[in-house]
Amino acid sequence: MAKSLVIVESPAKARTIGRYLGKDYTVEPSLGHIKDLPRKHLGVNVEKGFEPAYFVISGKAKVVSKLRRAAQRAEAIYLAADPDREGEAICAHLKEILTDKTLFAEAGPTDGRPRKKRKPAKKKASAQASQKNGKVVALDMPPPVSMKTKFLRVTMNEITKRAVREAFEKPGQIDHNLVNAQQARRILDRLVGYEVSPLLWDKVKRGLSAGRVQTVALRVVVEREREVRAFIAEEYWTIHANLSAAEPPAFDAKLMEFQGKKLEIANQQEADKHTAALQAAVYRAESVQQKERRRYPVPPFITSTLQQEAARKLRFGVKRTMMLAQRLYEGVELGEEGSVGLITYMRTDSTRVGQEALGEVRDLIALRYGREYLPDQPRFFKSKKGAQDAHEAVRPTAPSRAPEQVRAFLSEDEFKLYQLVWQRFVASQMAEAVFDQTTVDIQAGERRLRAVGSVPKFDGFLAVYEEGKDEQQRAEEEEEAEAARLPVVREGETLTLNALKPEQHFTQPPPRFTEATLVKELEQKGIGRPSTYASILSTILEREYVRKDKGKLSPTPLGEIVSDLLIKSFADIFDVQYTARMEEELDEVEEGKLDWRAALEEFYEKFALDLERANEEMESVKAGLPTQETCDRCGKPMLLRMGRHGLFLACSGYPDCTNTREPEFEVHGIDSDDTTPESEVQLCDNCGREMVIKRGRFGTFYACSGYPDCKTTKPLTARGRGAEPVPLNENCPECGGQLVEKHGRYGMFIACSNFPECRYTRQKTLGIKCPECQQGELVERRTRRGRRLFYGCSRYPECRFTVGYKPLAEPCPQCQAPLTFEKHLQDGTVRFCRKDGCGFQVTVAAPEKLVEAAPS
């Protein structure tokens, strides 16, 4: 019989760790958090020092019962949740549920209330619950563990045999500073969500939510959108001269100075003047400088840079990246080798690398690429201020395990992410790349031109990996990227003018955020931490405060209104700098430098004042917000109001005047170049008047501006939604061309960019093997009319497996079926098993309206 019980969060992690521990250990999963604040009540006693009231999460009674039974037989209990605040809180709650005599839970569909249309279940004392006061239930559980039972905390940065052995040889105790930091964050978020969300329900519409950090992230997106709208493009010109020296080839030089000063050409008139002067000038090479330029590798990944690079290179959303990274960390089945953790812990802000890993990767570089690719000493990278250096960077657990060695055992997406992590880590310890750079300054009368050429001399780390660039970075580096090989040019040599190329340009607005650049912005501003970036982005997208179109984020009209209302009423709480300072205070709580209650008291003092004022002064969209528009029927001011299908303008003279119309704000997520060109006005087929873009119940459409006299409408077709494919970092297996992602009638698919010459296509998969044929992968599809989403095998019609629920690559913890599924019910989102006779089901998310909800 096993003498020790080990508790981890997931079945995958349990399988991997169990392989290394042997028969003296039983490893059980908790399936994530086991206790939390109540869903339907505040759960925080502000008057008693912000005392939280934690309950066993609805649907977790069976898990708790199983853990308590297993704990009865154990002499020692090892708590092995992830090495961060959330993991430490899980460990603290696990210890409580194993030692407390009485456990309480909120009454839910699985705790205390029978499900409808089902026969009464036979009584199971281990997991039954008795009703108490209609709201809280006391769970009937196996007895708590003996007071003599030892509780030990083990943490590991990677799940490998060596790391597991070292962790269990030197166990520690629960770090209550980490627990307090997590608890403080949870209470802060609960106070804001619980107190502010009902304001939005009252002033805007039910079902909306506010969050301490999500609102600040929304503010950042809104402010960027307004910068884009307010931007006024300015004209400017550049002039390039194509020149020849005594030896070929010809080359381009850019006009840089006039009369010894930097030249900026504002319009065509100035450009023509300089072009005429250059046409008549004599060109002489005044100076020729040659130097060696070195480019150094970037550090290995931290959480934020992993999310950014996966978005740039793989087009993965932040949530998807973290889900895949979690799988690679917890363990993947590698045939006879069994379950193996392939990467280190993925929630980290440290670039530190352990000595053993440094030795392994240096040996690999020398063996695989040659000694010339290995620097004399290992590279050490400086982590940002406040980074938790107890963690390492995100890296492969075994650098010698090359991506091609494990490809057969990974889904397509898992392989891509592992390859990215492996390449980045290996490149970070390689020699720098070397370029020969030549700069030629050319005098042409009163004007000076410059030509820059760069030639690779040694590829160094670029043989393995080159960091992707954001839109703005690419624009800034265009000229450097275009730098080509120059001919031999001698100082004093007279050059021949072949052609002049004046070009008109316009300054560009700041780019809208992508998921990658928003994470980068939040990190730079100190908003959020590695464990929260994914949830921040998911929340503002799921709440429809922000829309993502072709990878670009823009606020919805609802998002802008919510942001404006909250920032006006809670100017200090939702201030970017204040939010960043709160993150620093939570870090201080984690370090034991600040009492968690003191941090909460400082926050709540401001928050309570703002809340009281907001209840009285916040404007109501339901009542109508004033606008500059006037009613075209009676001349009274129009009000902006919220209806069932979104925002609309209504006459303030209601009920005497019932005039309404669509607001004239920009329809976000549809850029001007996505739809009809500005020069091509859409006219009504019925009356000939101009058509305008409107938003209705089923999306955006064209409507006649003559409404209500003419009620003609027609679909809005966006060229970008089918005709502009998105390039992928992958080549066509048939012709070698670049693969692109396209939007078809039944959803997204992947095709060759050389169409129609090459007709290679494949469906975009979820990265999950078909449970029926074990050969194809599951793909997202829509019914013929596009009304219903379902999932099917990529080998259709050979394999006809389909399912109406979203499949998850998470095994069932009860029957070990390879997949579980997700569905949305009135009581919330649940994860369940479809296998006959299993019955596993657990709530994974509260109903949308109850997330940080006010009392019903």
What are these regions (language model features)?
Residues 2-5, 16, 97, 109-125, ...:
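Basic, low-complexity terminal or inter-domain segments flanking catalytic cores
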Residues 264-299, 490-493:
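Metal- or metallocofactor-binding catalytic centers and their adjacent structured scaffolds
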Residues 285-288, 297-310, 337-345, 509-521:
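Short acidic, hydrophobic short linear motifs in intrinsically disordered regions
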